[in-house]
A protein has these predicted regions:
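Short, low-complexity intrinsically disordered segments enriched in A/P/G/S/L with frequent Arg
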Residues: 2, 19, 23-24, 28-29, ...
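Active-site-flanking beta-strand signature of metal-NTP-handling nucleotidyl enzymes
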Residues: 47-52, 153-154
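Short beta-strand-to-loop capping motifs
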Residues: 51, 107-111, 157, 176, ...
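Short catalytic helix/loop segments, enriched in acidic residues and glycine
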Residues: 66-78
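Short, charge-patterned binding micro-sites
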Residues: 86-110, 141-142
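Short amphipathic alpha-helices in soluble, non-transmembrane regions
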Residues: 118-124
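Non-catalytic RNA-recognition surface used by pseudouridine synthases
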Residues: 130, 135-230, 240
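Conserved small/polar residues in nucleotide/adenosyl-binding loops
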Residues: 242-248
Length: 252
C-alpha cells in the first residue's frame, strides 16, 4: 500500500468504523475511573496518525484473535502513551506480509499530549518495523476509512533467471521473461468502473462489489517490474488477484 488521499470536508464522512473491540490476541483493559474523570474534565480529541511499516512480521492490519497485527501493535503503543485503552481505525485492511509507505489511522483520546510530540512518544513503544511519522488533531467526524477517497498499491515482480536475496519479502520472483507492454494492455482493461466480484476472496461482506480504478501502470526498471494501481477502494484480495493475472496474459 503506497498512499492515500482524503476528502477535504471531513464532515461529509460521519460514519464511524464499527470494527469489533476486544477481539485481539490481547484483552483491552477496561476504562479506569481516572480515565473516566479525565474524559469529564477534558473533551475527547480525534488524532490522525501517518505511519509506515514493514508487514513481514505481521498478519495484516486488522486486529485478530490469535496472531500479531499492525493495528494491535499500534493500539498497545498508543495506550501506553495516553494512559488509557484506545481503538485505532485504519484507512484499509492490508493483508499479511504487505508493507505500507503511507498509511493513515485515527484514534480518540482525552490526553493533552501535543501532536508534535505524539510520533516521538509512540515510536519509543513501537518495534523498529513500524514508524509513526506525523500526528495531527482532526475534525471529530474524520474517520480514516470513511474519509479515504483514493488508495494506491504497488506490487513488485523480480523478473530474472536468478534470484536476488535483497528482494526476498519485497518482490515476487518470476524467472520467465515478461513483456511489460503486453501486461500494460491487460492492465488497461481494469481501468474504469467495474464489478470485481470475480476477483476477490469469497465470503467477504460488502455492500457493493463495484469499484472504480483510476490508473494502472506497468513499468520496468532493469529486472524489476512494478505494477501500480489506484482506485477508490478494493475488495479483499482483489489487488493480489489482478496482479497475479497480468503475467499470464502473454500465454493467452
Amino acid at each position: 500500500m503506497r498512499s492515500y488521499e482524503f476528502a477535504e470536508d471531513y464532515r461529509k464522512n460521519d460514519a464511524i468504523c464499527r470494527a469489533d473491540v476486544g477481539i485481539g490476541p490481547y484483552k483491552r483493559p477496561p476504562i479506569s475511573t481516572a480515565h473516566t474523570q479525565m474524559i469529564r474534565k477534558y473533551p475527547m480529541r480525534n488524532i490522525a496518525l501517518t505511519l509506515k511499516y514493514l508487514g513481514t512480521a505481521y498478519h495484516g492490519w486488522q486486529v485478530q484473535k490469535t496472531v500479531t497485527t499492525v493495528g494491535q501493535t499500534l493500539e498497545e503503543a498508543a495506550a501506553a502513551v495516553v494512559g488509557h485503552p484506545v481503538h485505532m481505525t485504519g484507512c484499509g485492511r492490508t493483508d499479511a506480509g504487505v508493507h505500507a509507505r503511507v498509511y493513515v489511522a485515527n484514534f480518540r483520546t482525552s490526553a493533552r499530549i501535543p501532536c508534535d510530540r505524539i510520533p516521538y512518544a509512540l515510536n519509543t513503544h513501537l518495534p523498529e518495523d513500524i514508524v509513526v511519522t506525523n500526528a495531527m488533531e482532526v475534525h471529530e467526524d474524520f474517520n480514516a476509512i470513511g474519509s479515504c477517497v483514493k488508495k494506491e498499491y504497488t506490487y513488485l515482480i523480480y523478473n530474472s533467471g536468478i534470484r536476488d536475496p535483497f528482494y526476498v519479502n519485497r518482490a515476487w520472483f518470476y524467472p520467465k521473461h515478461l513483456d511489460e507492454t503486453v501486461m500494460q494492455r491487460a492492465a488497461d482493461c481494469f481501468i474504469g468502473t467495474h464489478d470485481f466480484a470475480a476477483v476477490r476472496s469469497v465470503g467477504t461482506d460488502v455492500k457493493s462489489t463495484v469499484r472504480t480504478v483510476y490508473d494502472y501502470k506497468v513499468e520496468r526498471d532493469g529486472d524489476l517490474i512494478s505494477l501500480r494501481v489506484s482506485a477508490n477502494g478494493f475488495l479483499y484480495n482483489t489487488v493480489s488477484y489482478t496482479h497475479l493475472t497480468l503475467p499470464t496474459t502473454e500465454r493467452v
